[in-house]
Every structure is written in C-alpha cells, then in structure tokens.
C-alpha cells in the first residue's frame, strides 16, 4: 500500500512537471495604462468582427499597427489617431479584414509603434 502511494505521488509529480499541450502562450487582448491616458484592445464586436483599437488622450498623429500571424509573417499598416467625436479622445482603428491577411488559426500578436518605438503593450488574439 505504501509503495502504491509513493508511486502515485511520483507519477503525479512527473506529470505536473511536464508542459501541458493545452497551455498556450496567450497575450492579453486589452490593456489600459496606469495613468488612464490610453487603452488598447484586440476584441470582437457584437457582429464577431475583429477590432484592433487604440484610444488615447495623449497620442496624436500617425501610428504604425503591426500584426504578426501564427506563420511568423508580419503585416504593418500606417494609421492615424482621429478625434471623430470631438471629445479629445483620439482613436486609431484599422480594419482587420481589409488591412491584414488571414493566416489561418493560431495566435496573432498586435503591436502599435509611434516615433520609432512601441507604444503600449503587445496584445494578442486567437483565430
């Protein structure tokens, strides 16, 4: 009996140390700065359309939005922060379907770059 318990504990320990196939490298799909100056998201709307959005009080001008696909290909588009509601919240929202290729199922990474450096966090989503 004692030997069976020891073997069971040993097997559980070994299984616990092995990486699980169900665990994947997930990036967050939204982020807001601690100061509240900006928020980013890579979510879907109610029509299941992918929305890549960056909203900010602080950022203006052009921004480069890059999506890295599961195939390791990267597509970048230049977009502009716009204040469409005249409320001093500037938004960039490039259209996923028309601006970025669908590279099939898997993890996608989204990065916003401005003035030569990354702006905000790396976000992600899965298809």
Q: Where in the sequence are the language-model features?
A:
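Intrinsic-disorder/low-complexity, polar/charged segments enriched in Ser/Thr/Lys/Arg/Asp/Glu/Gln
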Residues: 48-49, 95, 120
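Ordered hydrophobic segments in well-structured contexts
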Residues: 50-53, 64-66, 76, 88, ...
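Solvent-exposed serine/threonine-rich low-complexity stretches and specific carbohydrate-binding patches
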Residues: 73-89
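A short, sequence-level motif marking secondary-structure junctions
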Residues: 44-46, 81-84, 125-127
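N-terminal prepro-regions of secreted/extracellular proteins
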Residues: 1-42
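Short, exposed beta-strand-loop hairpins at the edges of beta-sheets
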Residues: 55-57, 99-126
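Short, surface-exposed binding/anchoring microloops in extracellular/periplasmic proteins
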Residues: 25-72
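Exposed aromatic-hydrophobic patches
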Residues: 86-101
